[in-house]
A protein has these predicted regions:
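Conserved alpha-helix/loop element of class I SAM-dependent methyltransferases that forms part
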Residues: 112-129
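S-adenosyl-L-methionine
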Residues: 171-204
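Conserved SAM-binding loop of SAM-dependent methyltransferases across substrates and taxa
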Residues: 139-152
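A conserved beta-strand element that flanks and buttresses the S-adenosyl-L-methionine
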Residues: 211
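Conserved class I S-adenosyl-L-methionine
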Residues: 129-138
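Conserved beta-strand signature within the Rossmann-like core of class I S-adenosyl-L-methionine
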Residues: 235-247
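A short, conserved alpha-helix within the catalytic core of class I
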Residues: 218-231
Length: 324
């Protein structure tokens, strides 16, 4: 005999006044509509399920890319072995209590997964480099990852504003060995001019690779161009991983409290076109603009790749000096 008793769960759902008001056939699939209780999660919600799902998918994607690469020649080619090759060398990644997932016994957080993607992209160049410059490194995740994966690095120069450098210095001092930490030279924005003069008197390029990830897009255009000119004169390679465009908050259902913040963001960086970041044709067109905009004078594009998932409107590009 079939039990015709209603589920208590569904009785509660159908008696919910909110859902009674949101069952219109014209709108039941929109954000906040009744369909989020039937076939899918709501597009906007307060849990971490979407973030963790994207993190897992990113780990899977990157791990497969590494394992299938012609430059990856490791005995451990099982699932998880690709990202493990880099992550296992990066100690103390849990500082700061990041959100993590477990991918084939790799405890993965987003920041260090991004770092693995970046050092894998730059692997060939990093192996032969001694001097690295990173402009605007955030709290230092990439510096941490590079210094622990590439022991050939002798000097790691970091340029940032003073208040951010305080966090970077404190973080890296905690996670790095004293010998690796001693390789870092912190250069305040105010001391950048002295660093430029020091580079000018050098008989050869002071920097092997200059790096900027996710910050040139947030800096005034004239400052970005000044950095690119310095890189052009003093570096063999330049690696950029920045947003290729701007987007309107409505595209991701953000309700602005202060339009001044958005208007200020539109003035930053070199790529200021506002596009639909979920339109493949618009992204493909804007990538060409980005690749040209961030190429230093007398440099050429060496290689590039699109970014994954929530970073699909970002792009990795490595430029090489024509004089190298």
């Amino acid at each position: 005999m079939v039990n015709k008793k209603k589920s208590n769960l569904w009785e509660n759902i159908f008696s919910d006044d909110f859902h009674q008001k949101n069952k219109s056939i014209e709108s039941f699939r929109q954000i906040g509509g009744f369909n989020n209780r039937l076939t899918s999660w709501d597009a906007i919600e307060t849990s971490s399920r979407y973030f963790k799902s994207l993190l897992y998918a990113f780990a899977e994607n990157l791990d497969n890319r590494i394992l299938q690469s012609v430059i990856f020649h490791q005995k451990d080619n099982r699932l998880g072995g690709g990202i493990k090759y880099y992550l296992k060398k990066i100690k103390n990644r849990s500082l700061g209590r990041p959100i993590t997932i477990n991918y084939y016994n790799n405890i993965v957080d987003l920041d260090y997964l991004l770092s693995v993607e970046e050092i894998f992209f730059l692997k060939s160049e990093l192996r032969k480099s001694k001097n690295i410059l990173e402009i605007g490194p955030g709290y230092g995740r990439l510096a941490h990852s590079i210094l622990q994966n590439f022991k050939n690095i002798k000097n790691y120069y970091i340029i940032d504003v003073d208040w951010m450098s305080e966090l970077t210095r404190a973080y890296l001092k905690r996670v790095l060995s004293s010998s690796d930490f001693s390789k870092i030279e912190f250069i305040s924005f105010d001391n950048y001019q002295k660093f430029k003069k020091r580079a000018e008197v050098s008989n050869q390029n002071l920097i092997d690779i200059s790096i900027n990830t996710n910050s040139f897009e947030e800096i005034e255009e004239n400052i970005v161009r000044d950095y690119l000119l310095f890189i052009s004169n003093n570096s063999q390679y330049f690696y950029s991983k920045n947003a290729i465009c701007k987007y309107h908050p409505n595209a991701v259902d953000i309700k602005l409290k202060d339009k001044a913040h958005y208007e200020a963001a539109l003035r930053m960086g070199l790529c200021k076109n506002v596009i639909d970041i979920y339109n493949s044709q618009a992204i493909a067109k804007q990538r060409k603009v980005y690749l040209k905009a961030y190429c230093p004078k007398n440099f050429k594009l060496s290689k590039d790749e699109k970014c994954f998932g929530q970073f699909l409107y970002y792009h990795s590009a490595l430029y090489e000096s024509k004089n190298s």
